[in-house]
Amino acid sequence: MYHCEICGAKADIHHIVHKHEGGYDIKLNYKYLCNYHHRGKIGPHNCIETDIKYKLEMQKKLFKLLPKDYYTAKELYGLLEITNSLLKKLVKNLKLYKEGYSKEEIIANLMGGKLYSYNILQEIELERLYHNINIG
């Protein structure tokens, strides 16, 4: 049984990069959340800030896990704790350079095809403030 990473209640697996966004079914893409913290008002399915925050956390972990600029498929298999079939899916979308697969491309692919910036959170907050001013 899984426990919510926030409150400790019974939890389900949340895919940080959702499957429909191109997310992989790997441990690094999991966050264990109870129903409230998963699908509630402040959960990643209903709160864009929470969703982006979790994606930024995952992306930061990936950059820490992959400090080199290039990796072989064998290295990725071990570091990402990924199945052979998911590894094949990952590398088929990547260009193989003479040095190996590019860290930036690997991470972007695992993040659903893009890299996230902390500026996104600021833009969302500014947009929300602007919207509230225009309504009020």
Where are these regions (language model features)?
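Short linker/helix segments within small regulatory modules
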Residues: 17-30
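Short Cys/His-centered divalent metal-binding micro-motifs
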Residues: 30-53
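Helix-turn-helix DNA-binding helix
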Residues: 87-88
